[in-house]
């Protein structure tokens, strides 16, 4: 207070009074008044900050001096007492008890039962340094004792003394291993869940790999048979649709269906005017059974024993394979489908010839027939897990068509 009184008087004489007199005698505008106010506020803040800094630095200096003096006193007291290290070889009986006690204290979070350890009285008790309270240290703290010593020197000295501690001796027994706690509320339930086979990914993969595929039910199989019969009957009654207007001669050559004429087969080709696939004049104009004029009845019966029993046909063939190929004309079945435009063909070589139109060299050619000409087919029910091969469906349709009136029989010679 004695030092602060002269400073306040000095501040009033040197700064407050002259500035107040100058402001009273000077008339300033609003702009100058604003600038002067900001300058006064800035000077005030600077002075207050400087006063606070000096006060804080003085407090810090006193605190550091007190800490240094207290550290020196503690070092002197520890040198005078010279306690025996608990890990030294002079007290080997207390080592197991101390290690067990430390392990129990570190595992307080585990649900372990308390263990009572009885330690016998030692002949040479360990003398610990006296513990000083904070109140006693504050009361006995000197003001300016050894102020020149820095805190770094004391810290270095303490670190050197602690680094030269003797290594702990080897233990004559094996310490018990404490299990790591499971981070869940119910440890027993978690252990049981981890041992379950459903938590093993290898077990789950093996179970799903060996699981058999579900078999179709009787209702699904019956529905599939009804769909096949409906498709076979529908193919007979479907009218042939006209070809679109952009049908050209080049397109007609690409999709020309050439049935081999060997062994008595006929040739059919699309008509440019109507787009229908018709037979040759020799087969379409005949009203009765077709008999070749170049051979007699006996020769034809021996060489071509298989006869087409379709209405107004009566054509003969040498084997059943040629007869089945011929039946495609009457039944309208086309088992080979183009994967690009979904167009159907009765022979595979015609499909391969048609696929060339979709190659990059002939990409300018557009579709010849519409993708879905059969708009009258009703919506079929959805069947799951039923995979029926394409050959089986075509064979079933051909069999149904043959049973309705186009049965091929071996002629009696």
UniProtKB/Swiss-Prot annotation:
Stretches annotated zinc finger (C2H2-type): 306-330, 336-358
Single GO MF annotation: zinc ion binding
Region Disordered, annotated ranges: 130-151, 259-290
UniProt-annotated location(s): Nucleus
Top-rank taxon: Eukaryota
GO cellular component annotations of the record: nucleus
Keywords, comma-separated and alphabetical: DNA-binding, Metal-binding, Nucleus, Repeat, Zinc, Zinc-finger
Protein name, as recorded: Putative zinc finger protein B0310.2
Origin species: Caenorhabditis elegans
């Amino acid at each position: 207070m004695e030092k602060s009184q002269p400073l306040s008087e000095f501040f009033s004489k040197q700064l407050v009074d002259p500035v107040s007199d100058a402001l009273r005698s000077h008339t300033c505008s609003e702009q100058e008044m604003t600038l002067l106010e900001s300058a006064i506020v800035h000077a005030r803040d600077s002075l207050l900050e400087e006063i606070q800094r000096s006060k804080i630095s003085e407090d810090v200096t006193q605190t550091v001096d007190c800490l240094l003096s207290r550290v020196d006193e503690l070092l002197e007291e520890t040198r005078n007492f010279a306690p025996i290290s608990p890990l030294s070889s002079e007290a080997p009986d207390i080592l197991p008890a101390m290690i067990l006690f430390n392990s129990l204290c570190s595992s307080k979070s585990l649900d372990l039962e308390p263990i009572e350890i009885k330690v016998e009285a030692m002949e040479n008790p360990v003398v610990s340094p006296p513990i000083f309270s904070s109140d006693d240290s504050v009361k006995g703290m000197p003001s300016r004792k050894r102020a020149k010593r820095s805190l770094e020197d004391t810290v270095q000295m303490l670190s050197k003394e602690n680094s030269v501690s003797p290594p702990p001796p080897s233990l004559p027994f094996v310490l018990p291993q404490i299990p790591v706690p499971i981070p869940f509320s119910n440890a027993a339930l978690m252990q049981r869940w981890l041992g379950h086979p459903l938590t093993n990914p290898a077990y789950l993969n093996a179970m799903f790999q060996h699981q058999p595929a579900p078999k179709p039910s009787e209702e699904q199989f019956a529905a599939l048979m009804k769909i096949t019969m409906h498709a076979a009957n529908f193919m007979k009654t479907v009218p042939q649709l006209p070809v679109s207007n952009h049908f050209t001669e080049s397109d007609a050559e690409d999709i020309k269906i050439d049935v081999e004429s060997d062994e008595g087969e006929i040739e059919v080709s699309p008509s440019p005017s109507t787009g229908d696939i018709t037979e040759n004049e020799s087969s379409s104009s005949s009203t009765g059974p077709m008999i070749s004029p170049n051979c007699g009845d006996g020769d034809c019966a021996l060489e071509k024993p298989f006869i087409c029993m379709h209405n107004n046909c009566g054509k003969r063939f040498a084997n059943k394979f040629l007869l089945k190929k011929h039946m495609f004309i009457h039944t309208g079945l086309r088992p080979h489908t183009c994967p690009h435009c979904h167009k159907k063909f009765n022979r595979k070589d015609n499909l391969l010839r048609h696929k060339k139109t979709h190659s990059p060299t002939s990409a300018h050619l557009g579709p010849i027939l519409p993708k879905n000409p059969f708009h009258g087919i009703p919506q079929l029910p959805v069947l799951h897990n039923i995979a029926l091969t394409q050959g089986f469906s075509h064979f079933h349709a051909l069999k149904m068509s043959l049973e309705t009136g186009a049965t091929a029989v071996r002629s009696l010679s």
